[in-house]
Amino acid sequence: MAKKVLIVEDNELNLRLFRDLLEAHGAEVRTIRDAREALEAIRGFLPQLVIMDIQLPHISGVELIRMMKDDPLLDAIPVMAVTAYAGKGDEGRVRQAGADAYVSKPISVSRFVTAVEGLAGPLGGGFKQAG
């Protein structure tokens, strides 16, 4: 059975890249661009993994992770933080908020898929070529 993954990312290019990679590996993917809608979407979908940008408008990814971890329905869902801003101390701050993995952009495809499967388990179908 395919793993369910929800992506919270405001950048359309990154969103499509992550979605296409995950779907090509057999995952069932939902996407959210607005962090203000994320908690409701996560509750409705109950994914095995949430992949989240940290630099989001309106609500930061760090704050959104904290909100998830404070919610008894969502606190056990692993979170993989993805960010272009990988400064000193950022990983510690993100992990302290409750992220289970931290990947900096630009992503390495193999590192990304390995991190996803490390948190969610095998995605459910192996690599599927488009066509």
Question: Model-flagged regions — what are they?
Answer:
Residues 13, 107-116:
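C-terminal output helix
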Residues 19, 63, 86-101, 111-114:
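Alpha4 helix (beta4-alpha4-beta5 surface) of REC/receiver domains from two-component response regulators
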Residues 13, 34-37, 60-66:
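Acidic catalytic/metal-coordinating carboxylates
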Residues 57, 75, 87:
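The feature encodes the CheY-like receiver
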Residues 16-24:
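Charged docking surfaces used in two-component/phosphorelay signaling
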Residues 45-51, 56:
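Active-site beta3 strand of CheY-like receiver
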Residues 9:
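Conserved acidic carboxylate
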